């Protein structure tokens, strides 16, 4: 029996349950084990809690032998590799885009200036401000139902959350607008899961690898390489989206390319620096590093140092 560690929220157990069911369908008995993390116990702003707030307890459970593997939202994993663990599988990604849930079925452009929009993410807050719509950004914590209720109760005019989370909980009917990357670049690895186990557990790693999706792994690798190079940690205002696309060469042969778009935004929305590049899935990390280098050339370091030292970066 493969014991799979998961956070206790409905979203987390739904995500991990999908991994469990996929393993069972392939003939590998599996069960979920709920682990409480520091991020679940705290009601403070996510970025004040530190990197790894949702993952450390799950990793400890693996190391102590209480579980065999753990399912993380990939974007919650620290960008620095931990040699004790291996990401044995990155399953096929859900929709990586951000989504708006607004009162009266409105889209962002229809909300009047001064409308209250909730988000838990400095990245979303910065890009929302950069749209120049005059929206008032408010911090947002709690599970997805709690967040949605803040709109239905009239406490907020809208919230911006990951579309993937809404999809996994069957709440896509609440979405009033899906934000295209040209409006808002998602968080690196948004919509993707990471299935992690002990680095030396080659037998389990081989079983988990049956769930791996090569295109998703390439995309996530490029996005997280960009994030790591920017030394941003998971709460900095960095967006990135990569995808594997088919192209045709001069001889009419189809081949795969990996495209990557990245941005760094000032928290006040006054500036957004964007860069993009194209590479191959087999050199995903190199693509991430090259787009990060272009962002640095365009002034990302100066923009991010301002974000790091801003005492008011609570949302």
UniProtKB/Swiss-Prot annotation:
Keyword Transferase: yes
Enzyme type, top EC level: transferase
Top-level taxon: Bacteria
Modified residues (S-(dipyrrolylmethanemethyl)cysteine): 234
UniProt record, GO biological process: protoporphyrinogen IX biosynthetic process
Classification via InterPro entries: HemC, Porphobilin_deaminase_cofac_BS, Porphobilin_deaminase_N, Porphobilinogen_deaminase_C, Porphobilinogen_deaminase_C_sf
Pathway(s) the chain acts in: Porphyrin-containing compound metabolism; protoporphyrin-IX biosynthesis; coproporphyrinogen-III from 5-aminolevulinate: step 2/4
GO molecular function, one term: hydroxymethylbilane synthase activity
Function noted in UniProt: Tetrapolymerization of the monopyrrole PBG into the hydroxymethylbilane pre-uroporphyrinogen in several discrete steps.
Subunit structure: Monomer.
Descriptive protein name: Porphobilinogen deaminase
Phylogenetic lineage: Bacteria, Bacillati, Actinomycetota, Actinomycetes, Mycobacteriales
Gene field: hemC
């Amino acid at each position: 029996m493969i014991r799979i560690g998961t956070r206790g929220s409905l979203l987390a157990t739904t995500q991990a349950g999908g991994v469990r069911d996929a393993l069972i369908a392939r003939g590998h008995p599996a069960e979920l084990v709920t682990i409480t993390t520091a991020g679940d116990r705290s009601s403070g702003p996510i970025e004040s809690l530190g990197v790894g707030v949702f993952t450390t307890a799950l990793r400890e459970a693996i190391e102590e032998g209480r579980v065999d593997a753990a399912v993380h939202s990939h974007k919650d994993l620290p960008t620095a590799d931990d040699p004790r663990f291996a990401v044995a599988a990155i399953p096929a990604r859900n929709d990586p885009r951000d989504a708006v849930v607004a009162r009266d079925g409105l889209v962002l452009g229809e909300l009047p200036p001064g409308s209250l929009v909730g988000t838990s993410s400095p990245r979303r807050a910065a890009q929302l401000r950069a749209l120049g719509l005059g929206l008032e950004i408010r911090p947002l914590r709690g599970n997805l139902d709690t967040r949605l209720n803040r709109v239905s109760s009239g406490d907020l005019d809208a919230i911006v959350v990951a579309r993937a989370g809404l999809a996994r909980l069957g709440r896509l009917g609440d979405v009033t607008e899906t934000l295209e990357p040209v409006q808002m670049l998602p968080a690196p690895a948004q919509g993707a899961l990471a299935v992690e186990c002990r680095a030396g557990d080659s037998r389990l790693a081989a079983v988990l690898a049956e769930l791996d999706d090569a295109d998703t792994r390439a995309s996530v690798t490029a996005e997280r390489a960009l994030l790591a190079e920017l030394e941003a940690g998971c709460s900095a205002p960095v967006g990135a989206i990569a995808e594997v696309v088919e192209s045709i060469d001069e001889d009419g042969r189809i081949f795969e390319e990996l495209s990557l778009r990245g941005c760094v935004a000032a928290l006040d929305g006054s500036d957004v620096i964007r860069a993009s590049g194209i590479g191959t899935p087999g050199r995903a990390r190199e693509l991430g590093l090259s787009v990060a280098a272009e962002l640095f050339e365009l002034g990302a370091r100066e923009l991010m140092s301002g974000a790091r030292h801003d005492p008011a970066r609570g949302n």
